[in-house]
Amino acid sequence: MIPRPHYSRELETFSKVYLLLGVIEIELRSRVPATLSRVNGNKFWYENFEFDSYPNYLIENVLKRRKGNPVGVESRLPFGFWVRIFRVKNFEMIWQGRINEIFPLLPKPNSKKTYDSLSRRLKRVHRLRNKIAHYELVKLKNQTQEIQDLMFLIRALGVEI
């Protein structure tokens, strides 16, 4: 018989981190559409901006599955979508002057340097999310930077946990 590691500590960490990831996803799913809808007063927030190919592909797939019905599109988009729209190249086109509506406690929200740091943190948190989603429990050890990024994002969102 192959010896199995004791998973209880890893599963406890997994559960806590997964819930924190959910907080970020829920907040982004709510705040991004609300913020982008105010730009042109269009309730279909995703029509106001030219996203790169991957986010556009995801939106088109959701609309196709829903037979063109745009209601609730945001609830069907994966975590990767929300991370991708905060890519560094989207700062001036989409987020400059608006990022504080999403992350109200982000220090120096109009700074390009701050935005670049935010984008990197979101990418690292996305990698952490994928490790959890694919049950890479062994890889969850020594993820201190990703956990710090996760907590930074939650604080920047102004969410109390």
What are these regions (language model features)?
Residues 1-161:
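Amphipathic alpha-helical interface elements
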